[in-house]
Amino acid sequence: MEIQQTHRKINRPLVSLALVGALVSITPQQSHAAFFTTVIIPAIVGGIATGAAVGTVSGLLGWGLKQAEEANKTPDKPDKVWRIQAGKGFNEFPNKEYDLYKSLLSSKIDGGWDWGNAARHYWVKDGQWNKLEVDMQNAVGTYNLSGLINFTGGDLDVNMQKATLRLGQFNGNSFTSYKDSADRTTRVDFNAKNILIDNFLEINNRVGSGAGRKASSTVLTLQASEGITSRENAEISLYDGATLNLASNSVKLMGNVWMGRLQYVGAYLAPSYSTINTSKVTGEVNFNHLTVGDHNAAQAGIIASNKTHIGTLDLWQSAGLNIIAPPEGGYKDKPNDKPSNTTQNNAKNDKQESSQNNSNTQVINPPNSAQKTEIQPTQVIDGPFAGGKNTVVNINRINTNADGTIRVGGFKASLTTNAAHLHIGKGGINLSNQASGRSLLVENLTGNITVDGPLRVNNQVGGYALAGSSANFEFKAGTDTKNGTATFNNDISLGRFVNLKVDAHTANFKGIDTGNGGFNTLDFSGVTNKVNINKLITASTNVAVKNFNINELVVKTNGVSVGEYTHFSEDIGSQSRINTVRLETGTRSIYSGGVKFKGGEKLVINDFYYAPWNYFDARNIKNVEITNKLAFGPQGSPWGTAKLMFNNLTLGQNAVMDYSQFSNLTIQGDFVNNQGTINYLVRGGQVATLNVGNAAAMFFSNNVDSATGFYQPLMKINSAQDLIKNKEHVLLKAKIIGYGNVSAGTDSIANVNLIEQFKERLALYNNNNRMDICVVRNTDDIKACGTAIGNQSMVNNPENYKYLEGKAWKNIGISKTANGSKISVHYLGNSTPTENGGNTTNLPTNTTNKVRFASYALIKNAPFARYSATPNLVAINQHDFGTIESVFELANRSNDIDTLYANSGAQGRDLLQTLLIDSHDAGYARTMIDATSANEITKQLNTATTTLNNIASLEHKTSGLQTLSLSNAMILNSRLVNLSRRHTNHIDSFAKRLQALKDQRFASLESAAEVLYQFAPKYEKPTNVWANAIGGTSLNSGGNASLYGTSAGVDAYLNGEVEAIVGGFGSYGYSSFSNQANSLNSGANNTNFGVYSRIFANQHEFDFEAQGALGSDQSSLNFKSALLRDLNQSYNYLAYSAATRASYGYDFAFFRNALVLKPSVGVSYNHLGSTNFKSNSNQKVALKNGASSQHLFNASANVEARYYYGDTSYFYMNAGVLQEFANFGSSNAVSLNTFKVNATRNPLNTHARVMMGGELKLAKEVFLNLGFVYLHNLISNIGHFASNLGMRYSF
C-alpha cells in the first residue's frame, strides 16, 4: 500500500465565533479531561508513585502516565500481535538508506478512506485492536518514514537500536487513535540509534477535518541512544490526549513544538491536555520554540530532566504549562511487579502460545483472560517534592497570545515548575493584553526565579492598559518552601494600569518605573523577608510591601494625577530603609502628588530631597530617621509649597536638615536632633519656626570642627545678617525641649549648664563667616570679621583694629534663648569691637614656633562665660589643635605629656594619637583621657606597642612553620641515621652470606664482614614508609606557643652504581600562640613538604635537602582596656618559607661499625615571608599591609654519635651550632590608620641545637621510633623544643 510522498501540511480551519453556538456539542473526551486535571497533574506534582517508592520512574512516570493515557479504563489488549523480523540483508550496509514503510511495514499495515472525516487513514492489519512488532535490532543504515498520515492504531513497536530513523523526509507523519466504545490508546514506540525529524509530526490528531470520529489517546515514544533532533520547519503537534516520551542522551528540537493544538472549529470551547516526558534524557533538553494552547485553555505538562532550555515559550491567554523537575538524586526504579500484573508480561506469555509461519510473520492469538482478576497498581499519595539542587529550567523569552474575547476578571496564563532554578533570559516577557484584562503567572513551587529581560505589554516596554482591563504580571518563588528568591536583573517599566505582584522569601529588583501615568499596583506583600529595589519611580502607585531596602525612591506627579498619591498600603514593619528619596516638582497645586504610608514601626532615610507641590505623609509610621540630609531638592524650580508630615522624626548624627518657609514640615509627635545640624534659611528677614507637636530633644557632643575649631553646631542660621533687627526669631517650639551632652553622658530639661553648652552650638553665619564670634590672628581675619558683622571700617582699615590680633571677640549684639519650650535668637544689630571694650579672650602662643592659633576647645576661664556655666567655646593652648598634646593641655594635665614621652616614647604617643584623635576626634579623646590616669595610659600603651611589634615581627608570623620544620629536621636525621647502618649482629639468611664468601680471600675479618653486611635488612627491605606524631613549643617570656601534628614520608636505600638514600615527606601541624596578657591569640594551619638524600663515598657522607612550607594564620586582638578597645579585631594572613641545605660529614667507625662518630659542616639558605593582613574590623584602626620577606644564609657545624645494636635498633645524638652570616629582605609596615609598625629583627642570629633519638623493633618489619630536639637562639634567648613518636614499615 502506497503512502503519500509529497510535501504538504494539513490545513487547519480558523476558529469562527459565529459558529460557537452551532458547535458547542463538539468537545474533547470529558472523562479524560477531568482525570488529567484532578489526578494526573496533581499526581505528578504531588509525587504519586506505585509500590513502595515515591518519585520513581516506573511509579511516578510509568504508572501515572499510563493512567493518563488510558483515562480510567481497562488496559488495552491486542486481539492479534503481528511480528516482523528484518533479515540479515539489513545488517550489511551502514551507509544505505531504506524506506521503512515499503521495506518492512507495508505488509502488515492496511489503509482506507474514512468517509466521516473525508480522509485516508492507516491501521495495523485486521484492525486497530491489533499490534505490530518489528524486530530490527541488528539492522544498520538510515530508515525513512514519510507520509504515514493518520495512523489510527493499534500499537506499533519498532526496535532498530543500531540504525538511524528519519521521520518526514518528503512528508510528515501523524499517529492518532481510533475512538470506539473501548476508548483504545494507540502506542507507537521507535527505538533507534539516532532519530531525525524533518517534517511535521502529529500526535492524537483527528483524521481529516475532525468533524467525524474523535480521537481517544495516543502515546508516541522516541528512544535514541545518541540523540533526537528536529529541523526548524519540522513542527511537532500534540493534540488533546497526546503524550510524547523522549529518551536519549540529548534532545534538540529546532522546530515549533505545539502542545494543545486545535484541529476543528469550536475546539477552543473546552481545554486540552497533553504531556511531554523527558525524564529519561540524560543531557540537556532544548526546545527552540514551544507553544501551549491554540485559542483554548490548554493544560500541558513536561516531566523534565535536570536541564531544560526553551528558546521562546508562547502561551495562550488561558493556557497553563507545568514543568516538573526530578527530585534530588533523580527518579528511582521501583521494585518489579509480579508478572501476572503487567501487560508486558502478558505479551511475553503470548509469545509462548504463538506459532510461526513460513513468511517469518507470527500471528498470535491472545490467551483467554476472562477468568483473571486484574489488580491495578497501588496509588500512594505524598506531598509535593522539590526539584534537585542542580535542576534548571531556562526560557529565553515568554510570550502570551490573546484574542478579543471578553470575560469578567479577564484571562490568566500560567507557567509552573518545581526546579531549583527558573531562569528567564534577556528576551524577557511579553504580555498581550485585551479588553477585560490579561494576566500571566510564573510560579516556582520550590525554587528561585530569575528574570534577565524586560517586561513588555503588547510588545512595548512601558506598554499600558486601560481602566478595567489591567495587565498583570505575577511571580511566585518558593511557594511551598517559603524560601525562594525572585530576582529581576533588568529595569522594569510599567505603563498605566499595569500591575506587578511578587511572592517570595526575598525579592531583588534592579529598577521599577511606574511613573508613566500611574495607577499601578506593586504587590510585594507576599515577600516574607526583604524586598531590595535599586531604584523605584512612582506616580499614583499602590505599593504593598513590608521590610524593604530601596536605594532610590523618585516620586513623580507628571501633571496628570490630581491629588493622587503613591500609597504604601501595607505596614512597612521595622526594617525598612530608603537610601535616597526624591520628590519631583509638581506643576501647580491642582496637579500635586506625593507619597503616603499606611503604617509601620520605623523608616530610615539617608537623603531626602523634597520639592514644591509634592507631599510626603509618614504620620502613620511611628519613627522616621534621617541619617544624612533633608533638603530642598530642585534648583531654579518655581517656588511652591512642599508638605512633609511625620509622627516622630529623628535627625541622625552628622545629618543636615535644610529648613525654610517652603518646607512646611509637620511633626505631630516628638523630634530628636541627635547631633545633626538644622540649617535655617532667612527669607524676607525671617526664619520659619519648626513646630513640634510634643517633645523635642537636642543631643550634642564635644566634637570640634577641625577646620574652624568650633563645636559642630546643632542649629545654623545662614544669611543671618538679613534677619529683622530688634525682633525675636523663634527657631523651634515644642511642649517640652530637653538638652543632652552625649560626650559627658548628661541630659536634662532645665539644666543651665547644658543649655549654655547648647547655645555655643547655635551659630549665625554671614556667608561662610561666623557672626556671633570672631577669631583674629592677622589682618585678614580682621577683614573677615568686618565682613561678617557688616563693619566696613574693619574691611577697609584693618590696621586700626590690630589690637584684636591674638584675641577671640564675641558679638554681644546677638542674644540666644534656649529653655524648656523655645529656642530663639534676638538680633539687635552687630556690636563694634573697641580696644578696651572687653568681650575678648587672648589666643595662646605655640612656644615652638611663636605662632598664634585659632583652634577652639573647652576651658572654664573665658571672661564672657557665665560663672556657673560649663566650659565654653574659646581659643586654646600652645599645641596645634588636633594633636593629643592639645587635649592633655586642655585637661590641665600638661605634665602628663612629659610622662607619656618618658615612659612610652614617640611610638606610644603616636599610637595614642591614632586611637583617640585620628580615629575619632578631640571630644572623644578628652572623654577617654579624663577617665584614665597617666600611669594607666602609659601602661596600656606599652602593652599595645609590645603586642603590635610582636604582630609585625616576621619571626612571630613564621614561628609555627619554624617549629614544624624543626620537628621534621629531627625526623629526617633519624631516618638518615637508620639507613646509614653498616652493622648487624644476626644473619637471618646465613646460607646466602656463606655462598657469597665461597672462593674468596680476605686480608682481615673486617673485609669479610663487608660482604656479610650486604645482606643486612636495609638491603633486603630497602624501602620504608614512616609516620610520626609531632609536638613542639616555644620557650620565651612573651607568651605561650605550641604545635602538634603529624608527619609522614617514604624513603629507600639505593645500592647500585651510587650508594645513596632518597626520600620525601609531608607534614601538617596546628600551631597556637597566646601572649601573657592574653591580648593576642593566634591559630594557624601549617603544612611542610620536601625531599632529602644522602650519598655515600666510602666513609664520606654528602647530605642534600629541600623543603617548602605554608601556613594560614587566624589571629585576634582582645584588649580589655577601654583605651585600647578599638584595636580589638580578628585578622588573617599567610606565612611561607622555602629552604635548601647541603652538608658534608666523615664517619669514624668503631666496634665493627656499631659506634660511629661523625663531624660535619654545612651551609643552608632560608626564605621566609608573609602576606598582608586582612582584618574584619570596620574601625579606622583595622590592621592593613604588613607583608614582609627575608632571605637568610647560614653555616653550621655539628658532631653526631650513632650507636647501632641488633639488626635494626639504634640510638643517636647530634649537637651543633648554626650561624647566620648574611640576611636581607623587605617589609611593608603594618598600618593602623595613621600609625605604622615597622618590623625589626636581630642583625645576625646564632643558634645552638641538640637532638637525640632511636628506634626499636616491635614486630617483623614494624618499628617504633622516638626523638627529641632543642634549639636555642643565643641572641634573643628564645628556645624551641620538639619531639616525635612514630612508626616505620619496611618492604
From Swiss-Prot:
Gene Ontology CC terms: cell outer membrane; cell surface; extracellular region; periplasmic space
InterPro entries: Autotransporte_beta (IPR005546), Autotransporte_beta_dom_sf (IPR036709), OM_autotransptr_brl_dom (IPR006315), Vacuolating_cytotoxin (IPR003842)
Polar residues composition bias: residue spans: 338-347, 354-374
All copies of domain Autotransporter, residue ranges: 1018-1291
Keywords recorded for this protein, A-Z: Cell outer membrane, Membrane, Periplasm, Secreted, Signal, Toxin, Transmembrane, Transmembrane beta strand, Virulence
Annotated stretches, region: Disordered: 326-374
Annotated gene: vacA
Domain notes per entry: The signal peptide, cleaved at the inner membrane, guides the autotransporter protein to the periplasmic space. Then, insertion of the C-terminal translocator domain in the outer membrane forms a hydrophilic pore for the translocation of the passenger domain to the bacterial cell surface, with subsequent cleavage.
GO molecular function terms noted in the UniProt entry: toxin activity
Function: Induces vacuolation of eukaryotic cells. Causes ulceration and gastric lesions.
Source domain of life: Bacteria
Residue ranges the record marks as coiled coil: none
Keyword Signal: yes
Organism: Helicobacter pylori
SMART domains documented for this protein: Autotransporter
One matching Pfam family: VacA
NCBIfam families: autotrans_barl
Leader sequence residues: 1-33
Descriptive protein name: Vacuolating cytotoxin autotransporter
